C-alpha cells in the first residue's frame, strides 16, 4: 500500500510537472516554424542551350572589348587615386579637406560609372538621396554580389565599412581610402565594439563626416529573402535611409554566393551579356521612435520588414553563422543545407550559442551521415538509441519530426533536443525515472531492473538492453547509481524524453485504477 501511495504521489507530481513544462514549450514551439526560404546562400543559374550558345558567341566579341576599355579607364583612375589619397591616414580621425571632396571625388565617380557602363551595366536610379542631416547612414539590401559596389558610386562615395586587408589591394585600396572608411580588424577580438563606437562617434559628431553606407546583411545571398540584419547601422539610433538593389534581368549572371558560380565565372558571364540592368532605389528616410532608439534589434527588424515589403520578399532569421554551419555540414559529408537552422532565431529562442549548435551538428552528423539524404530516419533513430522500433519510439520520433515528412533534419534535431528533451524540470523527471527503475529501492539500477521496465514500456518481451546498460554503467559495472544515471541522461537527452513519456504512461495507468476504500 505504501508503494501504491508513492506511485500516486508520483502521479500528482507529474501533473505539476506537466503544467510547468507545457507553457514554455508551447510558446517556444509557436515561434520556431520552418523558414520561408530553405537556403539563401546557394545559387544555381540554369543556362539553356540557346543561352549558353549566345553567351559564348557574344563573349568572344564583347569580353575582349570591354576588358580593354575597363583597363584603359583604370589606367586613368590610377593617378587620380594616388593624388586623392596622398597623406591620407588609413584610419582617419577627422574629415578630409574640402579640395579632395569637391575636385577629386566627382572625377572619380565619373570614371567609375563609365567603367561600369563599359561593362554593360545600365543603372536606373529611383527616389531621392538624403543629405547627411536627414540620414547619416544608408542601409543597402539585398546584398548578393560584388557588383553591389555600384550603390556606393550612386550614393556619391559615402564612407564604407571594410576590412583593413582590402586597403592593401592596389587601386581598390585607394578607392576605399577616398571614402574615409570605417575599418574592421578581423584579428582584433574587440573589433565589433570598436567599429560600433567609430560609427556612433561619426554620426553624432558635429564635424562634416561623409554619410556611412552599410550592407546590414553582412554577406551575399541569392536575393530570395532578406536575412538577419547586423546591428551596426542601428545601434546609434539615428535616422537611416534604406536603399534597395534590384537586377531585373531575364538571365541572372550577377549573383555570387558561398555555393554557386565563382567570382571569375560571374564576371565572364556578366561581361558576355549584351547589357545588365540594375536598379538602385532610395526609399524615404526612416526615423526611429523612442522604443527603436533604445532597442537596435527592434529598429533593425522594422527597417528590414519595410524593405522586404517594398521588394515583395520574405524575411528569414538566417545569418552569417548559418553560412558557417553550412560549410561545416559539407565538411562532415552532409548536404550543405543540413547546417541551416536560422541561427538568429534558434539562438535567441532556445538560448544556444555558436559552440552549442556546432557541437549538436557533430553529433547529428554521426547519426545522419549513413542515411541517403543526410537526414535521420526512424531506422537511424532506432540504431542511435539502441532500442527497437516500437510505438513509444515512433511517438518520440514524431515529436522531433516537426513537419511530419518521416525524417529529422538538423534544425528539427536541435529544436527537439532543446525543447522536448531538456524541459525546465529535468532534475525532477530524472529523479522520478530512477525511482521507477529501482524496483528493490536499494539506490541502484541493475541490468535486470532496466530490462524489466523497458520491456514493459516498449511492449517487447525479448528486448535486449545489455548494450544500452553497458553504455550507461560502463563495461565492468553491474549497477548504476543515480549520479551515473543522471550524467548519462543529460549527455543523451533523447533518453530523458523517453523516461518522461514512460512516467506519463505510469501516471495515466495509476489514475485509471479504482480508488482505495
From Swiss-Prot:
Family: Belongs to the 1-acyl-sn-glycerol-3-phosphate acyltransferase family.
The name this protein goes by in its record: Lysophosphatidylcholine acyltransferase 2B
Glycosylation sites: 29
Transmembrane intervals: 70-90, 103-123, 137-157
Written domain comment of the UniProt record: The HXXXXD motif is essential for acyltransferase activity.
Role played: Probable acetyltransferase.
Alphabetized InterPro entries for the sequence: EF-hand-dom_pair, EF_Hand_1_Ca_BS, EF_hand_dom, LPCAT1-like, Plipid/glycerol_acylTrfase
GO molecular-function terms, A-Z: 1-acylglycerophosphocholine O-acyltransferase activity; calcium ion binding; lysophosphatidic acid acyltransferase activity
Organismal lineage: Eukaryota, Metazoa, Chordata, Craniata, Vertebrata
Pathway involvement of the protein, from the record: Lipid metabolism; phospholipid metabolism
Residues that, per the record, bind Ca(2+) 1: 401, 403, 405, 407, 412
Alphabetical GO biological process terms: phospholipid biosynthetic process
Residues engaged in binding Ca(2+) 2: 438, 440, 442, 444, 449
Ranges where the EF-hand domain occurs: 388-423, 425-460
Topology class, membrane: Multi-pass membrane protein
Keywords associated with the record: Acyltransferase, Calcium, Glycoprotein, Lipid biosynthesis, Lipid metabolism, Membrane, Metal-binding, Phospholipid biosynthesis, Phospholipid metabolism, Repeat, Transferase, Transmembrane, Transmembrane helix
